[in-house]
From Swiss-Prot:
Top-level taxon of the source organism: Bacteria
InterPro entries, sorted: Nase_Fe-Fe_AnfO (IPR014287)
Name of protein: Uncharacterized protein in ferredoxin 2Fe-2S gene 3'region
Length: 141
C-alpha cells in the first residue's frame, strides 16, 4: 500500500532499526506530544477575537461567524467596537451571516463608510472604510 494512502487515512509511518520494544513507547510519546502541540496551536487560532492584519498595510480581515462559533458568549459589538474605535486602519473586511443591526449607526458616528456584498445565501462581506486615518498613524501603530 502506498505511503500516501496510509498517511491520508491517519496512519503514522515510521522507520527505525532495532527492536521495536525498545523504541515504541518513545515513538508513542512523540506522537502524542506532537498532536497536543497541534491542538494547542489550533485552539490559539480559534480564540483570536479581533481582526487580523492582511499583507497590505492598514487592511484587516475577520470572519465574524467563525469567531462567534468558537466564542459563543461574545457579541459582534464586543468583537468589533474596540477595533473600530481604537485601531487605525484603512479597510476592514468582515465576513458574517447577517449584518449586525448596530453597525450602520456606529460607523456613521465614527465617520466611516461601508459597503455590503452578498457572497452566498446567508453569507455577506462588509467592507468598512476608515476615511480619517493617515499614513503616519498607520505606520506608528
Amino acid at each position: 500500500i502506498p505511503y500516501s494512502v496510509l498517511k491520508k487515512s491517519g496512519f503514522v509511518i515510521a522507520e527505525a532499526d532495532g527492536n521495536p520494544e525498545e523504541f515504541l513507547d518513545e515513538l508513542m510519546e512523540m506522537i502524542i506530544e506532537s498532536k497536543e502541540k497541534e491542538a494547542k496551536r489550533r485552539k490559539a487560532q480559534d480564540t483570536v477575537i479581533e481582526p487580523i492584519a492582511l499583507e497590505k498595510q492598514g487592511e484587516y480581515f475577520i470572519n465574524l461567524e467563525r469567531v462567534q462559533n468558537n466564542n459563543p458568549g461574545i457579541s459582534s459589538k464586543k468583537i468589533l467596537q474596540p477595533f473600530l474605535k481604537n485601531k487605525p486602519f484603512r479597510e476592514l473586511k468582515i465576513v458574517c451571516n447577517h449584518i449586525p443591526k448596530w453597525i450602520e449607526n456606529e460607523l456613521m458616528t465614527l465617520g466611516m463608510k461601508f459597503e455590503v456584498k452578498k457572497l452566498t445565501e446567508g453569507e455577506f462581506e462588509v467592507k468598512v472604510y476608515n476615511q480619517f486615518n493617515d499614513e503616519k498613524t498607520l505606520v506608528n501603530r
